[in-house]
């Protein structure tokens, strides 16, 4: 059971990470930092994590080790996690490549103290890399709806892959992000079509 102090340099603005769901992500992106560690077991909700003291005054990235909003995640699990987080006076970052799932929970009380983020690593679709994730444009359309609803949004362009500038700028802009995070491939054992200049 753990509320982990954030140590990475990608999200320096986050104070902690918290992972009540663990295991294989449906999106199966080969560059995922979790895939490099070991063979992951099936996705599960760790009920013991719903007993962790989340403290107060923290900015917690919930679900940093798997996409807790993927299409195969049971709604009951998401509801349990949101309800639990809402019991603490913190701010939360929820990130997904499937932001359409966010739409089901926009009226949940925890959203009043949350930021919703999606990954838009390129405007292109690389099927062998992005696999089961929704298309970047689909993500941007949903994030536009979320921003119009009044919930703060972020976009993460990581790992940044080759893109078409005008189209990528359009997708990011559609999300009306308060912040854009940009990062490169951190899995040196995986070759991606990264920008060359």
Language model regions located:
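N-terminal [4Fe-4S]-dependent radical SAM core
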Residues: 1-61, 67
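Conserved AdoMet/S-adenosylmethionine-binding subsite of the radical SAM
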Residues: 45-197
